[in-house]
Design a protein with these regions (language model features):
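Short, charged, intrinsically disordered terminal tails
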Residues: 107-111
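STAS-typified acidic loop motif
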Residues: 3-32
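Amphipathic alpha-helical interaction surfaces in cytosolic regulatory modules
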Residues: 24-100
Length: 112
């Protein structure tokens, strides 16, 4: 089970790119990486590029929800970009597709 997380900081937003699997074993690392992004200047908008995430269980969803709450408490926005069908299905089944802002293409979110 591998998880890769990278961040790119821009003037008004940060893009966090995640690839691999988010589960009980990798969720703590994701939580730490996202916490570091939120501490570093707290951008107005955080975009999480999910296009490389193959699997995400309830532990991973809880990490994403925690991040969403932190961003919203500070007046920011969090967007999930390009989740794969399996992850999108989990978001739909759990009703989280109505909680998160989900965009189909990472490029439309980042403006690139």
């Amino acid at each position: 089970m591998e998880l890769n997380v990278s961040s790119r900081f821009h003037d008004d937003h940060t893009i966090v790119t995640i690839s691999g699997e988010i589960d009980l074993y990798t969720a703590p690392r994701l939580h730490s990486e996202l916490a570091a992004v939120l501490v570093d200047g707290m951008p107005a908008r955080v975009v999480i590029d999910m296009s490389g995430v193959e699997f995400c269980d309830s532990t991973g969803m809880n990490v994403l929800l925690s991040c969403l709450r932190q961003v919203q408490e500070r007046g920011g926005e969090l967007e999930l970009a390009a989740p794969r069908p399996a992850v999108k299905k989990i978001l739909q089944v759990t009703g989280l597709d109505s909680v998160f802002t989900i965009v189909n293409e990472p490029t439309s979110v980042t403006g690139n």
